[in-house]
């Protein structure tokens, strides 16, 4: 009897697994027959090639000086706007490129191969800030802000606080209604792009008693009284500004509420899935950049009469890293395509970010080792890649949060 019950349960489990796989890999009406994840449209290929050229000619000469000064060169930000890289998915009517999400992911990856700091500036602006406006903001806010964000105004995403990191909705920043305005009071921490930003997306609670249902998203201009305070001195991505942002009775028009009052938590949850794919792309680009920097050296340097890259122990190492980078890239591209097809992608986004950040650590660490003492110096970008990679396991959801997200979705899939 028990054997029969177990067999029946096993058949049910197998059938459920088959349905899950079919749902995940079924042909989408948007794409026709399935093809390689490397299959890019003409526009996507052009975007990738253009960004590759921009990164090499405009960004690369300034990477080391920006890292040493811990400051983004203003000419780089202007260059990103001039190249059309700050409104990649923004509709043409608002001055954007009206390109695909994959185009944005390709741009983030290619920038990260040269400098992850520039990459994350572009990433946060596109995948978080612009997407919030495109998806949730009123037509009036879109008309006012999207053209600026596509052409000359940098944005930032103000969610984290000193006591609200992984527990993102334990917010203390308050928004009090006063006539046709809200008055914001509180302090945000770890805000990327904040030193240079003109537009701040701020998450605050209108009523702490409501818990997460009181959280609301506001559009706040720097000119409204935002104070960008302490700038963090960081291990890596030093040219990317990370600051404390203070709101001391900052008055914001009620019309600057994004979406509905009390729906900010929904915006944050949904938008961070896209942001995680962006961070995965950044980590893939970083890993590839470190790999590309170290590999030629293995076939130039000789020890014991042989090229270092010809020793079998070394061959196994760089072959494994190449596999890891390829797998991380495919996870990232798959998550991007699922998002474009309007299919569930939260699990795949978490997987991509988790794995890509792990691969970036392994690849950059190995690359430093492969180049020996030279890799440990500041004359090459390898030690910078090694420092830059660590943030991938921390921001936009720590690795433990990604694992928790994946496990939660898997448990639901196998219990439903």
Predicted regions and their residues:
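Alpha-helical interface subdomain recognition
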Residues: 3-124, 136-141, 148, 152, ...
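Flexible, glycine-rich active-site loops centered on histidine and acidic residues
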Residues: 130-136, 157
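A short, Trp-centered hydrophobic/proline-enriched beta-strand micro-motif
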Residues: 151-160
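Conserved hydrophobic/aromatic beta-strand scaffold that supports enzyme active sites
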Residues: 156, 170-174, 181, 199-203, ...
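Short Gly/Pro-enriched turn/cap motifs at secondary-structure boundaries
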Residues: 163-166, 190-193, 207-209, 234-241
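Flexible, small-/acidic-enriched active-site or ligand-binding loops
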Residues: 170-172, 223-253
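A short core secondary-structure module
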Residues: 181, 185-227
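Long, acidic (Asp/Glu-rich), low-complexity accessory segments flanking structured domains
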Residues: 249-267
């Amino acid at each position: 009897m028990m054997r029969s019950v177990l067999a029946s349960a096993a058949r049910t489990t197998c059938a459920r697994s088959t349905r899950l796989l079919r749902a995940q890999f079924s042909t989408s009406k948007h794409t026709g027959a399935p093809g390689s994840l490397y299959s890019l449209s003409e526009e996507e290929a052009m975007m990738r090639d253009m960004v590759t050229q921009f990164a090499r000619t405009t960004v690369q000469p300034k990477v080391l000086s920006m890292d040493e000064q811990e400051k983004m060169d203003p000419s780089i930000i202007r260059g990103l706007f001039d190249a059309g890289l700050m409104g990649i998915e923004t509709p043409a009517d608002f001055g954007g490129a009206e390109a695909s999400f994959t185009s944005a992911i390709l741009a983030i990856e290619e920038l990260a191969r040269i400098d992850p700091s520039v990459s994350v500036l572009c990433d946060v602006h596109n995948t978080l800030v612009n997407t919030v406006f495109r998806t949730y903001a009123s037509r009036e806010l879109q008309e006012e802000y999207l053209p600026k964000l596509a052409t000359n105004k940098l944005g930032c995403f103000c969610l984290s606080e000193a006591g609200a990191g992984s527990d993102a909705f334990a917010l203390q920043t308050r928004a009090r209604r006063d006539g046709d305005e809200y008055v914001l009071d509180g302090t945000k921490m770890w805000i990327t792009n904040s030193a240079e930003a003109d537009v701040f997306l701020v998450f605050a609670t209108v009523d702490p008693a409501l818990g997460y249902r009181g959280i609301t998203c506001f559009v706040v201009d720097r000119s409204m009284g935002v104070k960008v305070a302490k700038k963090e001195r960081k291990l890596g991505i030093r040219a990317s500004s990370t600051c404390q942002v203070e709101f001391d009775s900052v008055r914001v028009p009620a019309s600057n509420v994004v979406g509905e009052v009390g729906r900010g938590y929904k915006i944050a949850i949904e938008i961070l899935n896209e942001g995680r794919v962006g961070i995965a792309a950044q980590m893939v680009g970083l890993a590839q950049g470190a790999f590309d920097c170290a590999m030629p050296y293995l076939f130039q340097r000789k020890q014991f009469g042989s090229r270092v890259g010809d020793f079998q122990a070394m061959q196994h190492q760089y072959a494994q890293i190449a596999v890891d980078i390829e797998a991380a890239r495919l996870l990232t591209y798959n998550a991007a395509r699922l998002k474009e097809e309007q299919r569930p992608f939260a699990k795949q986004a978490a997987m991509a970010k988790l794995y890509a950040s792990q691969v970036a650590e392994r690849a950059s660490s190995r690359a430093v080792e492969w180049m020996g003492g030279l890799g440990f110096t500041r004359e090459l970008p390898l030690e910078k890649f090694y420092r830059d990679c660590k943030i991938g396991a921390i921001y936009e959801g720590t690795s433990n949060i990604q694992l928790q997200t994946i496990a939660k979705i898997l448990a639901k899939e196998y219990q439903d």
